[in-house]
Amino acid sequence: MTTAKELQKNLTWEFPHIAKKNTAAKEAAFAYCEGYKEFLDTAKTEREFTAKAVEKLAAAGYVPFEEGKEYKPGDKVYFVNRGKSLAMSTFGTAPLEAGVRLNAAHIDSPRLDLKPNPVYENHEMAYFKTHYYGGIRKYQWVTVPLAMHGVIIKKNGELVKVCVGENAGDPVFCVTDLLPHLGAKQNERKLGEGIKGEELNIVIGSLPFVDESEEEGVKDAVKLNALALLNEMYGITEHDFMRAEIEFVPATKAQDVGLDRSLIGAYGQDDKVCAYTALTAEIDTKAPYY
């Protein structure tokens, strides 16, 4: 009579653990992920990912796609769509009529975007008004360090790149929350409403602009001080935010997780875990059929 263990052995199949079956593959994966972590740290937004990807593509011999130009098998090209997405290809030996193979991934990730007129002051604190992008758990975005990324188009048409909070010595930003012993009413909310979307406003300053020649001071002096600092850093004014694309993301770096360092903790792995691997797979493609 066949025992249950014998039947299980003969009829079932268990996916092998790569760390047990192939030590070399595990070591290769660890080495590969060093580049992946570096990419996660420096390509947190669509624009940054696109720019970093173009650098890697150019280094690998890819050139911008030219419409109407004839290409031969093995030619490597890329096309950038308005600085926020891109396509890349190695031409295969088969004609287009034989079909194509596509590998697609999205490079945007959940974040906090600034509203068009975001700067305001309340109770002698200056804030940015935000609206969340993507499927976020809003309570996860409070009391964590945030970095400011994006671009601003000035009145003269100049594009200004903005990044604050990623480099050593940079200030960071945050969304505040109530102390546990002061949040009794908040504690009664359902999990999804613990922090509401309209409460995801970012602290940008608490010191007023001081003008010793003005005895009474000015209205919204903390807001003015924040704007003065931004003007000093980037030469922008409040009106320039109407032509801006500013995003706030966690100001953290990718790190190994666990004593065995077998996991990666980082912002933006949805879906850069697919986008980065698609990018490197394309670069590694040499002589495809399709």
Task: Please describe what each predicted stretch is.
Residues M1-Y290:
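N-terminal hydrophobic/helix-forming segments and targeting peptides
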